[in-house]
Each structure stands twice: as structure tokens, then as C-alpha cells.
């Protein structure tokens, strides 16, 4: 048997995996010998390993699809089709809709509904929509979708041009893979030898219409999350009058909110993973992948092969002007500003929305975190200036959630006019959790509602979110795999969970969350000796071992994420099986790619070819996660409970996708009556139920709609935020001084004095319990000072630097003034020096409370 192969321009033979699987071990070794794949010749590999090795170095590229603009490409294709001999093959069984409708600058996707009957030889090929005069009107792709082989979908990249002809007589030329690949190389200027004739299937088309997309009146809304991002638009009647009833919008709802959907490989999802991957580093334009495409990039890499994927990119906002090193599989690298990468991520979402709803977006509303509202808005003003709406009327995430609640209560007529309501919202997202309080009241005027809303940031945890839950599952998975492969030095999952099976809430009240997970952490570190995931520790090892360990982490973390979704995305998933073998179709099974995991065997990292199945049940996972979830609820609610403030709130709302876990509600009941908690979890929900995640988008769009149509006069106000940090320093004699106390009062500037030399002032960021998070250094140099009068200093810094404080500075001393900046979520340090009774003002420096230096990241290679 011979393998199916493709001869490219350089005469390299490429092999298909499906054909290799039918060959004998001897035939596979012969391919390795012939193709000089030394790893398959020297080492005694079995059949699976030989196939993996051949596919790595000589695997056929699956599809050669024309998906982007190449100067002169369309002209070359059109000229060839006009001048070559075209042989029409019989195609009675092939047909398409009588009319195709395209929009200028927008793509045609599977949801547009243009299909032809399935024909294997046409799957993954290019098709050419031609006019009767052989004018090339559009370049299309024929693709399968959702793993079904009933039909092929006609799609088109947004970058490719479309045109109509005078005569309404069109046809679609479809061709086999070899001819399609030839046209691909011709389009990109790579093919020099062209066939004398080309065989095609010709599908008649009555009409091909190209329209201009409609511009939406309202902004689109984006909820940028640590793990997932969502987006949506409000479609009014005017929109439907313009676009008509074509397939693309037949499932859209008129005068309602409609969500952007993203293709996840098996279907469509309203959630886009906030993940960015690097496909290629090029001088002109780096090729980046987003969401599911970025995750597939990481999953497609070989065990010791490099890949560059960024998770948790929402944390970049605090330091968006920093640079990140991007690297592709060829090892090419360069530095790119975070702001530029984020801009391209949001443009991707905007383009997906435009393509989905056949429209143009003129404005974008992006909900911001409550505590970083002003910093967040400034960043988006810089990276997306062409899309920014009125900054002053943009909602933060909590306010958007609250407005959605108010809107629903108005529809249900459950709000009393002029009564002041107080709400407490716990937003547990993928990477962070925030607690905010809100006051609101409404007045029903003749023309519109008048709504007053005030928000106050109460507390937060930058290190707790859905990723923590995934990480805990990953820890148990890693330990189970190490035990399953024969290492009995690590305790079993059963033994670990038996240790944790106690009166969890009271144990954490007395000993804390760290003590609850101490035994788990201890055994997890033992498992690291067999199945390493701390790839940061391997940066000094060779490239191959570094990427093996990096693949270990991402494979286990992504598998744990799938396990979490099965348990908490679908009611009834009481048990999940993790297996490396593709067996009969079983419900609630996660397939673990054994080729991506490397275990220590002696002094080398090797693939474990036989990985036994691992079973996890719902009750084990509930026990595992109870400590984390109670810990965060206790942190937020205990002070409110003991002070009695909890009774002031009309209701408590849980939002964020992680909050659909029942453990949150159970933990809250320790502090408040259950009927106060607004917790949405309908019976028989499935994995497509994203209601909690969509609340922020819903609220933002309802707010934008009500303002635009004059349905509500909305007044927004920000209360004084509670800062969960303290800034301290030490005097010359070792006494600690609190410069900023966010727990008590952070409006007042703190001061500390030093003798003037070129000195370094250490500053300490601590939490409410006095635990140190981070150390900052302010470097003070004499050349940075300039002489100023107090009046000049006051004109710049106002009440932050009082005259009585500057008058007390002795000659030769410098006094540091430190105060918090609520809007910037950080603090300022300004030195004032006195010499010969004259004042000198030093350089001001701003420090962010939350930075890469201390905020916990699950993707830094240290887990």
C-alpha cells in the first residue's frame, strides 16, 4: 500500500495520517528511511510512535484555502480561468441556493446557510464564483462544519473582494484537491507550472448580489473577561428593514439583544476564550490567533515543540504599555506592546460581530472593572480611538449587572417609586472576584424613568476566580495520573480527600484556607518529581525539555477545564472519565492526549504510552472546591456580617460564570438568609447556558438602548471605594509607618523623612491582615529636584502637600509625600527637599497597586 501524498513546489512528499494508519510497521520504517527521518530509523519505535514522527516532519497540510488578500492574486486566477481549457464534469447531484448575498468587506460563514451536497473530494477546497463572461466575482471555500458530512458550506474571507456583473448569470466552479491546491499556489504567486486544462464541477447560480452593510445606531457591548469574553448588539426594526430575511439573520430577534457567536470546533459558542496565540512572527504583520484558534494552536504542537500562547490577558490592563516577547514555532521572536496585541484581539471580536450581523460597528462599549474604571477607559481610548463611545456614560461591570436587574424589575413591576434600594453584587469571574455595593432609586416621570445609581467598591481578590477552581481540579488530576502510572510515593486522591473531609467551614474559620489545602499542596509537590509542570524551572534546560514541561502544564490545565465544564455546565454529570484511548462513544468522557505528557524516566523526560483511565466524581470535586469557595465568601462577608451592615441590603446578587456552582450559595447561607440571594440556576440547563456570563452584556445594552431612545434619564455616581491595601515604610530607627491606609481613610497623604543623599526608599504593599504582597522602590536623586515655592507646589498637588508639612522639613532632609489615587488604582510618591530654607520639588512617581510583580498568575510556569 502506498501513502497518499502531495508533491509541492519543492517536491516534498507530504503524508496523510489516515493512510499511514493502514500501513504496517515495516512500511512506516521504510518511509522514515526514504525521507531521512533519522528519529524513526535509529530508535526502535512502535507503530504509533512512527506515525507520530512521520506526521511531525512530513505530515500533509490539510487544506490549501485562499483566505486573505494577495496583491495580483485575483487577476492571476481570473486570467488563468479565462485562457485555459475548462472541462465540465457531470454534476447533477450538486446544487446550491439560487441566490447568494454578500456584503462588502464582510465574510460569508457557515451560519449564512449557503451549502452544496457533501462530496468528499471537494471538502477543504477552493471554489470560484464566475460571471457568464468569465469574470471572477468571488473566491469561496468549501468546508465541513461540526463534524457532519451531510453538506459542505460555502464560505468567504472578509478580505477577499466581491463583484457583480451586468448579466445575472453565474456559476460556481468546484474542483478536486489537486486542482484547488494548484489554484492556491497560483493565487499566492507560488506556482509556475500550470496545467493545460482543468476539470471542474459547474453549479449554476441565478443571481449574486453584493450590498453595503448597515451601520448600527447603538454601540456594540463587550464584556472582557479573564477567561472568556462575550459580545452582543441590540438589533432594532430599522436594522431588519435593511438586511431583509436572509439566512444570516433568520434566527436573530427583532428589538432585542443578540449575541456574537464564535466557532469552537464542534459548533458555536457565545463565549470566546480570552486567549491569544502567535502563529507567525513576520516583519510586515505578525499573524496572531484568538480564542479557540489560539487554544487549537497550543493543542496542535508536538510534545517538545515550541508555542507561544497568552492566557489571562485581562491582567495586562494594569500595565498595558509594557512589551511582551512573541515567538513562533520557527523560533523567530520580537517585542510587541501589550496594547497592540489587545487592540487586535478586540478588532477580531468587532469583525466577528460585523460578519455575524452583516453590519458596521461605529461605537463600542466595553465594561470596565469597578476598581480600575478610569485606567481601563484610558487604555481603550488609546487602543480603540475610532470606536470609543462617550467615556463618562460608560458603565463598569457591576453597574451593568445592576442595570440589567433594575430593567428586569421594572418590566416585572416589582420596584417601588422613590424607595432607595441597596444591593450587594459578588462577581466571580475567571481570574478575579469583586464585591461592590450599590444604591439605586427610580422615579416614574411623564416621558421617561429617572434612575439614580451609585456604586462603591467594597472588596476584591485579584487571585481568586474560575482559574483557581480549574487549578484545584488539575492538582487532583496530576496526582491521579502519577499514581496510575505506578508512583506509590504520592498519596492517592482518596487519601487526600479523606483528610479534607471535615467540618470545612469551621476548620477554615479557625485555621484558614492554606491549612485546609496543605496536604494537597504537599502531595502535589511530590507529583512534580514524576510529572513536571513548573516550566519556569526549566528555562535553563534545553529547548526540548522546556517545551515538554510547558506542554505538560497546558495539557493538564486544559483537561481540567473540560472536566470542570462537564461537572458544572451540565446537570447530571455525576462522574467524568479521563482516558487516553479513543473508545466507544461514552458520555462525560475527556480524551487526554498521551503524546503531550512527558514523565521523568531516570534522567530523561519520556512519553508514557500506557496511561490508565482516571475517574472523578461530582462529590469528590465538591469536597475539593468547598474550601476555596467558602474562603472567598468568608473574606467578603464576615466584616459585613459582624458589623450588621449585611441587613441593610435589599438583595445579594451572584454574577460571573463561576457563581453557577451551588457551593457559592451554600457558603453565603452562613452569613445571610437564603431568600436574600439572587442566584440563577434553572433545572435541566446544559453546557450552552451562559446566562450568568451574559448578564454584563445584557445590562450594558439595555442601558445604551434606554439612553438612546429616551426611555430613561440615568444619573451615575461613584462612591468612595474601600481600598483593601496599606502602604507602609520604615523610619531610620526601624519603626513601621502607615502612609496609606485604605481600610480606614485613604484620602490623606502620609509622610516619611530621610536625610538627603542619592537614596532608595523601600515601600511595602500589604493587605488588610498585614501580609506583605509586594515591595516597591522609589529612587531619589538630587539632579531630579528643582527649586519651587510652596505656592507652585500647591498649584500642582493641592491638599496632598500641606504647607504645615513642608514648613517642618529641616535643612538637608527630604520628606516623601505618599497618597492613593482612587481613579488610577495606585499611589503617588512625591519628594520635597529643603536646603538653605528653600524648597525643592522632586520627581513624582506612580505605582500601581496590582502589577505583574505580585499578582498571582496560573500561567507563569510556577504551578
What would you call each of these model-derived segments?
Residues 209-242, 305-308, 314, 410-454, ...:
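Gly/Thr-rich phosphate-binding beta-strand-loop-beta motif of the actin/hexokinase/Hsp70
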Residues 342, 470-475, 479, 517-715:
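Helical "lid/coupling" subdomains associated with nucleotide-phosphate turnover
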Residues 237-271, 419, 446-459, 680-685:
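Flexible phosphate/Mg2+-sensing switch loops adjacent to catalytic phosphate-binding sites
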Residues 353-360, 370, 376-420:
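Hydrophobic, small-residue-rich alpha-helical packing segments that form membrane-like cores
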Residues 65-191, 485-505, 678-807:
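Acidic, glycine/GT-rich loop-and beta-edge segments that sit at the periphery of enzyme/chaperone cores
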Residues 68-182, 250-364, 368, 478-561, ...:
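Phosphate-binding loop and its immediate beta->loop->alpha context
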Residues 2-68:
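Basic helix-extension-helix modules of the SAP/HeH family
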Residues 192-217, 393-426, 693-711:
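Conserved phosphate-binding catalytic cores of ATP/NTP-utilizing and phosphoryl-transfer enzymes
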Amino acid at each position: 500500500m502506498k501513502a497518499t501524498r502531495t508533491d509541492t513546489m519543492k517536491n516534498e512528499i507530504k503524508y496523510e495520517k489516515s493512510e499511514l494508519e493502514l500501513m504496517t510497521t515495516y512500511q512506516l520504517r521504510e518511509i522514515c528511511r526514504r525521507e531521512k527521518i533519522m528519529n524513526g530509523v535509529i530508535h526502535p519505535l512502535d507503530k504509533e510512535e512512527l506515525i507520530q514522527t512521520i506526521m511531525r516532519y512530513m505530515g500533509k497540510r490539510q487544506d490549501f484555502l485562499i483566505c486573505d488578500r494577495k496583491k495580483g492574486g485575483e487577476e492571476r486566477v481570473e486570467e488563468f480561468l479565462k485562457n485555459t481549457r475548462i472541462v465540465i464534469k457531470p454534476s447533477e447531484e450538486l446544487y446550491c441556493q439560487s441566490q447568494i448575498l454578500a456584503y462588502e468587506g464582510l465574510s460569508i460563514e457557515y451560519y449564512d446557510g449557503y451549502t452544496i451536497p457533501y462530496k468528499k473530494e471537494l471538502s477543504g477546497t477552493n471554489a470560484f464564483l464566475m460571471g457568464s463572461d468569465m469574470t471572477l466575482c468571488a473566491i469561496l471555500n468549501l468546508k465541513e462544519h461540526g463534524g457532519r458530512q451531510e453538506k459542505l458550506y460555502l464560505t468567504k474571507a472578509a478580505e477577499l473582494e466581491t463583484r457583480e456583473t451586468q448579466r445575472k448569470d453565474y456559476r460556481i466552479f468546484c474542483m478536486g484537491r489537486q486542482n484547488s491546491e494548484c489554484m492556491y499556489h497560483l493565487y499566492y504567486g507560488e506556482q509556475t507550472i500550470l496545467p493545460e486544462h482543468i476539470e471542474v464541477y459547474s453549479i449554476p447560480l441565478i443571481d449574486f448580489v453584493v450590498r453595503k452593510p448597515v451601520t448600527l445606531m447603538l454601540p456594540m457591548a463587550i464584556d472582557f473577561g479573564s477567561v472568556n469574553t462575550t459580545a452582543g448588539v441590540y438589533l432594532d426594526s430599522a436594522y431588519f428593514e435593511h438586511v431583509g430575511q436572509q439566512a444570516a439573520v433568520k434566527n436573530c430577534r427583532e428589538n432585542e439583544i443578540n449575541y456574537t457567536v464564535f466557532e469552537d470546533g464542534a459548533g458555536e459558542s457565545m463565549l470566546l476564550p480570552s486567549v491569544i496565540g502567535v502563529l507567525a512572527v513576520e516583519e510586515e504583520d505578525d499573524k496572531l490567533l484568538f480564542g479557540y484558534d489560539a487554544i487549537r494552536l497550543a493543542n496542535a504542537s508536538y510534545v517538545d515543540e515550541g508555542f507561544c500562547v497568552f492566557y489571562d490577558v485581562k491582567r495586562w490592563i494594569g500595565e498595558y504599555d509594557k512589551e511582551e516577547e512573541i515567538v513562533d514555532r520557527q523560533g523567530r521572536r520580537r517585542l510587541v506592546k501589550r496594547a497592540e496585541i489587545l487592540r487586535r484581539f478586540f478588532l477580531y471580536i468587532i469583525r466577528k460581530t460585523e460578519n455575524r450581523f452583516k453590519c458596521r460597528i461605529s461605537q463600542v462599549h466595553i465594561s470596565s472593572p469597578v476598581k480600575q474604571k478610569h485606567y481601563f477607559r484610558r487604555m481603550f481610548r488609546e487602543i480603540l480611538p475610532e470606536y470609543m463611545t462617550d467615556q463618562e456614560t460608560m458603565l463598569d461591570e457591576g453597574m451593568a449587572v445592576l442595570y440589567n436587574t433594575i430593567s428586569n424589575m421594572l418590566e416585572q413591576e416589582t420596584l417601588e417609586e422613590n424607595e432607595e434600594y441597596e444591593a450587594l453584587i459578588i462577581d466571580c469571574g475567571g481570574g478575579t472576584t469583586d464585591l461592590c455595593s450599590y444604591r439605586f432609586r427610580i422615579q416614574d416621570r411623564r416621558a421617561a424613568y429617572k434612575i439614580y445609581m451609585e456604586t462603591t467598591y467594597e472588596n476584591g481578590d485579584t487571585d481568586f476566580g474560575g482559574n483557581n477552581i480549574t487549578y484545584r481540579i488539575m492538582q487532583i488530576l496530576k496526582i491521579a495520573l502519577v499514581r496510575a502510572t505506578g508512583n506509590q510515593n504520592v498519596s492517592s486522591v482518596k487519601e487526600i480527600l479523606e483528610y479534607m473531609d471535615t467540618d470545612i467551614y469551621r476548620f477554615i474559620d479557625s485555621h484558614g484556607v492554606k491549612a485546609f489545602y496543605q496536604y494537597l499542596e504537599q502531595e502535589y509537590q511530590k507529583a512534580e518529581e514524576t510529572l513536571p509542570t513548573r516550566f519556569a524551572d526549566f528555562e535553563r534546560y534545553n529547548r526540548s525539555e522546556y517545551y515538554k514541561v510547558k506542554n505538560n502544564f497546558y495539557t493538564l490545565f486544559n483537561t481540567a477545564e473540560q472536566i470542570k465544564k462537564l461537572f458544572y455546565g451540565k446537570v447530571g454529570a455525576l462522574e467524568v472519565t479521563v482516558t487516553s484511548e479513543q473508545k466507544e462513544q461514552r458520555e462525560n468522557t475527556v480524551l487526554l492526549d498521551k503524546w503531550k505528557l512527558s514523565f521523568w524516566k531516570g534522567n530523561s523526560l519520556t512519553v508514557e504510552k500506557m496511561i490508565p483511565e482516571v475517574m472523578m466524581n461530582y462529590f469528590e470535586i465538591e469536597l475539593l472546591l468547598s474550601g476555596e469557595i467558602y474562603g472567598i465568601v468568608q473574606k467578603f462577608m464576615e466584616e459585613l456580617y459582624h458589623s450588621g451592615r449585611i441587613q441593610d441590603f435589599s438583595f445579594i446578587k451572584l454574577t460571573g460564570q463561576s457563581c453557577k456552582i451551588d457551593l457559592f450559595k451554600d457558603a453565603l447561607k452562613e452569613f445571610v438568609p437564603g431568600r436574600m440571594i439572587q442566584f440563577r440556576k434553572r433545572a435541566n440547563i446544559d453546557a450552552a447556558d451562559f446566562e450568568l456570563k451574559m448578564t454584563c452584556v445584557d445590562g450594558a445594552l439595555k442601558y445604551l438602548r434606554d439612553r438612546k431612545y429616551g426611555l430613561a434619564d440615568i444619573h451615575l455616581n461613584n462612591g468612595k471605594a474601600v481600598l483593601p491595601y496599606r502602604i507602609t515604610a520604615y523610619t531610620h530607627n526601624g519603626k513601621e509607618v502607615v502612609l496609606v491606609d485604605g481600610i480606614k481613610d485613604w484620602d490623606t497623604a502620609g509622610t516619611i523623612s530621610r536625610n538627603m543623599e542619592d537614596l532608595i526608599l523601600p515601600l511595602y504593599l500589604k493587605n488588610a491582615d498585614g501580609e506583605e504582597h509586594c515591595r516597591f522602590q522609589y529612587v531619589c536623586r538630587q539632579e531630579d529636584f528643582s527649586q519651587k515655592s510652596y505656592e507652585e507646589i500647591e498649584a500642582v498637588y493641592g491638599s496632598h502637600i500641606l504647607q504645615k508639612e513642608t514648613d517642618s522639613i529641616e535643612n538637608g532632609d527630604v520628606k516623601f509625600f505618599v497618597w492613593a489615587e482612587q481613579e488610577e488604582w495606585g499611589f503617588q510618591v512625591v519628594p520635597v527637599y529643603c536646603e538653605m530654607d528653600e524648597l525643592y520639588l522632586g520627581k513624582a512617581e506612580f505605582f500601581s497597586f496590582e502589577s505583574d510583580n505580585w499578582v498571582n498568575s496560573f500561567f507563569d510556569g510556577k504551578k
